[in-house]
Amino acid sequence: MKSQLLSLAVAVTTISQGVVGQEPFGWPFKPMVTQDDLQNKIKLKDIMAGVEKLQSISDAHPEKNRVFGGNGHKDTVEWIYNEIKATGYYDVKKQEQVHLWSHAEATVSANGKDLKASAMSYSPPASKIMAELVVAKNNGCNATDYPENTQGKIVLVERGVCSFGEKSSQAGDAKAAGAIVYNNVPGSLAGTLGGLDKRHVPTAGLSQEDGKNLATLIASGKVDVTMNVISLFENRTTWNVIAETKGGDHNNVIMLGAHSDSVDAGPGINDNGSGSIGIMTVAKALTNFKLNNAVRFAWWTAEEFGLLGSTFYVNSLDDRELHKVKLYLNFDMIGSPNFANQIYDGDGSAYNMTGPAGSAEIEYLFEKFFDDQGIPHQPTAFTGRSDYSAFIKRNVPAGGLFTGAEVVKTPEQVKLFGGEAGVAYDKNYHGKGDTVANINKGAIFLNTRAIAYSVAEYARSLKGFPTRPKTGKRDVNPQYSKMPGGGCGHHTVFM
């Protein structure tokens, strides 16, 4: 008996020292995490308190947003860091980096009629370009798509197949004065050229309706366009927040992430406060348990400007360190008001774009979560248009959830998920209306429980999960022009 008490005393003394990278206080006495137990720790009131905090952070600043490098995002980063650090369960760090911020506005008129346009971020500025409009063929991704008389004219290009940046570059190579990209699905179009490039020309976005109307007008006669683009640029310091459980096998890391920044236009409570708070809620709930595999949470910066934070992080890891990450889970927009329960198509069965080995199994796990409760779900395009992109480019298995952005809900989807047909999943996407009032409480609660379900499964065991592919480079650029949603900003950021 004496020896048992001595052993216990030694164990408690060791735990109380709180050695960094070792198990936190009380670890041996915590129950092993299970899917049911972790899900039961998820409370809607905690989720809503989190999104309301992000709203208050945005409201505290005149810009009313949480765009990277701005005061709203700086406060977001500090709050997340302090909340997770205070648990004592994680080793937490802020990963500093500098990225180029851009803000752009555009006006476009055709034959004297004003159109509702948005400028692509990182677009070169333009002061009252007046030129004839011509149409590019085949989505404008190749030099042969541009008419011989493109020089000095503004070119109209349909979205799809290649990135906005590539379209702008091809237009520049054809010596166009500017480019207008119109959507290939209903709704307006906002995005980014992905960075500065001397090949780019001033570039704006239009809705599918306005773009098709212009194409029809050109077919029947001359269309003169006036285009203005105002662009601002600034190098900004910003941070990822990375938190890893002190306990668990650090050579078998389960990683999940969500971007913590918003667009300039608003507070970004669904995009992506919902994902940020979803994983934070799970991170806090996980502190009640011990686990076998370490879990690493990430809150990414600057997703809205081209997946910059997650790409910076992945590029900071050599192959040996990245190989410790056995899978990556991404959660971006999980509380859309007119939601659909969507799972990244890791096996490629719906969109013919497969992820690295293990991505299919992640998809099947989320399918099981919904199926076991009799809840409908559907695949969403696994195209690399969110923060998982940098991971799958290095051959890390990935998956995740998404409840929809600007794509319009169909009558068939209404039968599955309820809501309103003919209305976007999130009509306030990338707008000032993306506030707490924009959150569907049922969707965010359900999807946060799904996050908990997946974390508990993989933190407990990777038994049956495919052997981690060798870390390397992998092409994930899709070649689909009509592919519906695949995430938030990434759906319109690049393509």
From Swiss-Prot:
GO terms for cellular component: extracellular region. Its cofactor is Zn(2+). Its main location: secreted. Residues 1-21 form the signal peptide. The record marks Y429 as: Transition state stabilizer. InterPro entries: M28_fam, M28_SGAP-like, PA_dom_sf, PA_domain, Peptidase_M28. Zn(2+) 1 binds at H259, D271, D332. Gene3D superfamilies: 3.50.30.30, Zn peptidases. The keyword Iron does not apply. Zn(2+) 2 binds at D271, E304, H430. Residues 130-216 form the PA domain. GO terms for biological process: proteolysis. Keywords: Aminopeptidase, Glycoprotein, Hydrolase, Metal-binding, Metalloprotease, Protease, Secreted, Signal, Virulence, Zinc. It holds the Pfam family PA. Binds 2 Zn(2+) ions per subunit. Its EC number is 3.4.11.-. The active site is at E303. GO terms for molecular function: aminopeptidase activity; metal ion binding; metalloexopeptidase activity. Monomer. Belongs to the peptidase M28 family. M28A subfamily. Extracellular aminopeptidase that releases a wide variety of amino acids from natural peptides and contributes to pathogenicity. This is Probable leucine aminopeptidase 2. The gene is LAP2.
